[in-house]
Amino acid sequence: MTKSNLYRQYQKTAKIPYQLYNRRPGTDYGWLEVVTGNMFSGKSEHLIMSYFDILQADRFYVRSAQREGIDVIPRNVKAYKHSADKRYAESSIIAHSGMSIPCTAVDSVDRLVLDILTEDIHVALIDEVQFFQEKSESGQYAIVEAALHLLADKRFIIMAGLDKDFRGLPFGPIADLLAIADAKPYYVSTCAVCGAPATLPQRLIDGKPARYDDPVVLVGAAESYEPRCRSCHQILTDEDSYINKMEDLKAL
């Protein structure tokens, strides 16, 4: 008997779970991936491809375990998004490329966590996470506290959202989520004005840059936002004049 066969026989005899030598996030340990970047950069595509990759990986995992004579089950995988995102379909995450997956829309962190726990979801994919802006009694973003609790419960969480608002400032809970994330994929789009790498969302109202003091949350697609680089990004001030942060820095 070869060494590998001896090891397999030992595992079967000792009844060591298959997960101990091929561990999965969501059942054996917690893992948080926070996908960020600009508008139209591919964040939702990343989330959608992750959804299909996880389902395929689990099919392979279960077949491999069964060949070893060990019974394991695939992880429960489910996608969510904030109900504030009404751009395409309420029950789907749809990327700008047209790719889509089914999802459940929720309007609060409490409803999100309740659904994950009630349905025993091992892998939760959450789009537009920047809209979960409610805070707990401790003053912390509720989505951050929820993520920590879910990670302690060995859940696999993949979140996607804008890292900056239309002013170029950290968007809601994203900065705190990035601080606790185990993986941080970042995506850059192309400036709609000059074609340079774009890291800022430009909000447009009737074709003109938005005011600095406008509400942070305004859900839209191409008609209200476009990706821009730092040189082309503009904001309207109270004096009805446009400001560009890069130009302001050069003047210092």
What is each model feature region?
Residues 2-115, 165-176, 186-189, 210-211, ...:
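Conserved P-loop
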Residues 149-172:
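Sensor-1/coupling segment of RecA-like P-loop NTPase cores
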Residues 48, 52, 144, 148-151:
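A structural alpha-helix within SAM-dependent methyltransferase catalytic domains
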Residues 129-147, 166-171:
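Conserved ATPase-coupling elements of RecA-like P-loop NTPase cores
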Residues 118-123:
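Short acidic/histidine-rich motifs immediately flanking catalytic phosphotransfer sites
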Residues 190-218:
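Short recognition patches in nucleic-acid-associated and regulatory proteins
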